Amino acid sequence: MNTASCEKEAPSLSRDEAIAILDTPDEELEALIDRASSLRYKYKGNRVSIHILTNARSGNCSQDCAYCAQSCRSTADIDKYKWVDEDKLYQDNDFVNDYHLSRHCIGLSGMKFTDKEIEELARRIRKMKEQGTHLCCSIGFLTEHQAKVLKEAGLDRINHNLNS
């Protein structure tokens, strides 16, 4: 492994550049993926980062992704809850830090969230961030205001978890 390549800082994308990538025509996706892979290798090397995922909201998603147990239409035998027990969330966060994992990912089923729900999530993020944990969320649609609230709470990354 070439560790020198791991020390380089990857360039950031502007909002317009990110939107242009999202608008990539299907026939150009393979070339885009190839380029993304070469950039990943250039800036991150041949490394693996280990994350832990806490299912913070389970089931009752309004989306109807046929393969997904989180869908409200799914007959899968899963636990369904609006919020995972806070102790579980914080225990998982401790695990990330105790074992020097790369990131704590918080997954939430659902398409949209109220501002009150986002504030509750932000409260939990602030508490976990006190330990210096790198945090990300796999979450549905957010308003610009909601994204700012989560960022200000200390969230490092957002993954849009919706599919069609």
Residue ranges and their predicted role:
Residues 21, 53-54, 139:
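Glycine- and other small-residue-rich loops at beta-strand/loop junctions that grip anionic moieties
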Residues 29, 61, 114-118:
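Alpha-helix N-cap/helix-start motif
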